UniProtKB/Swiss-Prot annotation:
GO terms assigned for molecular function: rRNA binding; structural constituent of ribosome
Gene Ontology cellular component terms for the protein in this record: cytosolic small ribosomal subunit
Keyword match RNA-binding: yes
Keywords linked to the UniProt accession: Ribonucleoprotein, Ribosomal protein, RNA-binding, rRNA-binding
Protein name: Small ribosomal subunit protein uS17
InterPro entries, alphabetized: NA-bd_OB-fold, Ribosomal_uS17, Ribosomal_uS17_bact/chlr, Ribosomal_uS17_CS
Natural source organism: Shewanella amazonensis (strain ATCC BAA-1098 / SB2B)
Assembly and oligomerization: Part of the 30S ribosomal subunit.
Known function: One of the primary rRNA binding proteins, it binds specifically to the 5'-end of 16S ribosomal RNA.
PANTHER family listed in its UniProt record: 40S RIBOSOMAL PROTEIN S11 FAMILY MEMBER, SMALL RIBOSOMAL SUBUNIT PROTEIN US17M
Family from the record: Belongs to the universal ribosomal protein uS17 family.
Biological-process GO terms, alphabetical: translation
Amino acid sequence: MSDKIRTLQGRVTSNKMDKSITVAVERLVKHPIYGKFIKRTTKIHAHDELNQCNEGDIVTIRECRPLSKTKSWTLVDVVSKA
């Protein structure tokens, strides 16, 4: 098992929950037959202790222990404000 903690960067799509945000993380996937690269989006719930994020912000999140049923990521920093 790897000791490296996973970190991702994405855009905040929702901050309506208390101390929680929803982050959309985009990745490129190559189509198996045609070879074209396609954008795929994953929505991740992350913990925002200080409620400092707004919709549209670019943020860095890292994996942590499960904090709730759907939340196992936490906010590291805000890269740029919307």
